[in-house]
From Swiss-Prot:
Protein name: Phosphopantetheine adenylyltransferase
Record-annotated site: Transition state stabilizer: H18
Enzyme nomenclature, EC number: 2.7.7.3
Domain of life: Bacteria
Keyword Nucleotidyltransferase carried by entry: yes
MF annotations from Gene Ontology: ATP binding; pantetheine-phosphate adenylyltransferase activity
Entry similarity comment: Belongs to the bacterial CoaD family.
Transmembrane region(s): none
Subunit architecture: Homohexamer.
CDD domains: PPAT
Pathway: Cofactor biosynthesis; coenzyme A biosynthesis; CoA from (R)-pantothenate: step 4/5
Residues where ATP binds: S10, F11, H18, G94, L95, R96, E104, V129, R130, P131, I132, T133, A134, T135
Amino acid sequence: MSRIALYPGSFDPVTNGHLDVVRHAVALCDKLVVAIGIHPGKKPLFTTEERLAMVERVFGPVAKAAGCDFGCTTYDNLTVTAAEKVGATIMIRGLRDGTDLDYEMQIAGMNETMAPAIHTVFLPASVGVRPITATLVRQIAAMGGDVSAFVPAEVASALKSKFAAGSPA
């Protein structure tokens, strides 16, 4: 039986923090599926297609180098439903600090009640990526700041292009 893990998030954009989680997650499973949540009430900076492409280009080679199968999907329902759909028994969540832990523990408890076969695995962020959030990256990029220390090079380029084309709403 292969160990399938789901790593959910908005990935708007992919950050070095997300990449750190993936580098650790691929050691824990036979297949990692990154699931991009689609929330009707939110207007992401990058389209779903752009985020899928980013996730595949940035995370795919990391999984391949580790000998881990990789997949990417989207979902617009409960995260546990997305996990069940891909056959995942592991839910990967990254933690930056105690605030993340408190929130993620609540979610993990609810998920465990709804889907007892899916186990949440918390991966603490490496020291160098703990302060990074996608929200802060978007804000810095929107103000013309250099985000190259916080995101993979191709994501920094995509952010620069996105904001050079005119400030997204």
